[in-house]
């Protein structure tokens, strides 16, 4: 089996529009949670979210292409291009048909879906955009990454709710470890801070509904009351070790195992004894 390392990374997050600013914010303990600005929250039970602030795609996506992308896809294309730059692949010779792209998203283009359903309802089917479907389906995110960077290896999407991004990285890891590819771009993206998205999660009592941003995301506290909806994207460049060494790439880390499970307990709640999480960790350690 091949050894797999990380040679590039990119991020668009609620605490930074790029990798460096995100990393510095994390080190200094900055809080990305604040009041909703992406829509009028006056009818909402929930008022705190973690939005990507002052997002500017212009350095990575041309205006015409961006108009055909949902916000979640804009995030991942920017993050993927940051990862590409960080990896040094732009100055290396490599086979673009040997690059796999695998991106996870739990919901996909919810902003596009909401906008187009509103058009259908108010103005009729003739006003629905021809880009409605190709902008909203989850696999458009890896597709745009492949097209923007010219990668011709397998291009796949993972949809496993909150585990989508992690599963994408694990799937990419295994494809390199087992010798199918030398390079993979893997990660996740989400942009579900819309009125419909927040309403749906709030009505199933999944979201925190208080107004104290410093006590909103406290998953291990006895007073926890739900999660905070965020958005953004993170992409890693995974590479076979010898391939990375041959081009003198900077190596950030090595991935040595990955595990999955399903507790088969409930559609939203995890097993109270953590059986699924335990099994996944055990499988990762033994992988």
Where are these regions (language model features)?
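Active-site-adjacent elements of ketosynthase-type condensing enzymes
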Residues: 41-51, 108-112, 191-217, 259-279
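Structural signature of cysteine-dependent C-C bond-forming condensing enzymes
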Residues: 1, 86-104, 115-130, 147-155, ...
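Active-site-proximal alpha-helical scaffold in enzymes
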Residues: 76-89, 141-142, 146-190, 228-249
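Condensing-enzyme catalytic core mediating Claisen C-C bond formation in acyl metabolism
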Residues: 3-7, 30, 34, 212-287
């Amino acid at each position: 089996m091949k050894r797999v390392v990380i040679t590039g990374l990119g991020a668009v997050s609620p605490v930074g529009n790029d990798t460096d600013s995100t990393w510095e914010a994390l080190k200094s303990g900055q809080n990305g949670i604040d009041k909703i600005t992406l829509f009028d929250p006056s009818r909402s039970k929930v008022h705190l979210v973690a939005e990507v602030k002052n997002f500017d795609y212009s350095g990575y996506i041309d205006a015409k292409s961006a108009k055909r992308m949902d916000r979640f896809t804009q995030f991942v294309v920017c993050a993927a291009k940051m990862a590409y730059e960080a990896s040094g692949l732009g100055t290396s010779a490599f086979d673009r048909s040997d690059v796999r792209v695998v991106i996870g998203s739990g919901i996909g283009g919810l902003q596009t879906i909401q906008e187009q359903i509103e058009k259908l309802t108010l103005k009729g089917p003739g006003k629905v955009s021809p880009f409605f479907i190709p902008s909203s389906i989850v696999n458009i995110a890896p597709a745009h990454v492949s097209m923007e960077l010219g990668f011709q290896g397998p291009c796949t999407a993972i949809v496993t709710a909150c585990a989508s991004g992690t599963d994408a990285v694990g799937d990419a890891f295994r494809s390199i470890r087992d010798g199918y590819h030398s390079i993979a771009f893997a990660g996740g993206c989400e942009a579900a801070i819309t009125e419909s998205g927040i309403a749906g999660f709030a009505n199933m009592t999944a979201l925190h509904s208080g107004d104290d941003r410093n006590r909103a995301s406290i998953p291990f506290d006895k007073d926890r009351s739900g999660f905070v909806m965020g958005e953004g994207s993170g992409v890693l460049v995974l590479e076979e070790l010898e391939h990375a060494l041959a081009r003198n790439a900077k190596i950030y880390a090595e991935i040595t195992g990955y595990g999955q499970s399903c507790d088969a307990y409930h559609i939203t709640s995890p097993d109270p004894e953590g059986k699924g999480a335990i099994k996944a960790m055990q499988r990762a350690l033994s992988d």
